[in-house]
Amino acid sequence: MSNITIYHNPACGTSRNTLEMIRNSGNEPTVIHYLENPPSRDELVKLIADMGISVRALLRKNVEPYEELGLEEDKFTDDQLIDFMLQHPILINRPIVVTPLGTRLCRPSEVVLDILPDAQKGAFAKEDGEKVVDEAGKRLK
């Protein structure tokens, strides 16, 4: 069983790049397709707490439910925002990665390098060609 978990959306380039960087470290993570299998309320609350971010910081703003529900307004409590994310998982920003070294919202994708327990096994470039890791497994930025 893997000690790394990624809350993943395969339609998202950032999420795909993050998953491939995990694999480039020699690890095969547990992949949770959170749109089909959203976290429970308790899991989501724990993820937010472990990341040390606000509930609002996890909200995706460029999706239809955000505007339809008027979530740009500050009138909603954290509990209400969590309810909206559970009802509309597309509102949960991604990818979220959990490792023994921490939990992070990996935006940009190279944030994952800060919490991987194993070094990169070789060069890595994002889908757009941007080089992130050199041949020796060293981070370029």
From Swiss-Prot:
Keyword field contains Oxidoreductase: yes
GO terms under biological process: response to arsenic-containing substance
InterPro entries: Arsenate_reductase, Arsenate_reductase-like, Thioredoxin-like_sf
Major enzyme class: oxidoreductase
Domain of life: Bacteria
Active site (record annotation): C12 (nucleophile)
Keyword Oxidoreductase in annotation: yes
Catalytic activity: [glutaredoxin]-dithiol + arsenate + glutathione + H(+) = glutathionyl-S-S-[glutaredoxin] + arsenite + H2O
GO MF annotation: an example: arsenate reductase (glutaredoxin) activity
Enzyme Commission no: 1.20.4.1
Site (Important for activity): H8, R60, R94, R107
Disulfide bonds: none
Function: Involved in resistance to arsenate. Catalyzes the reduction of arsenate [As(V)] to arsenite [As(III)].
NCBIfam families: arsC, PRK10026.1
Protein name: Arsenate reductase
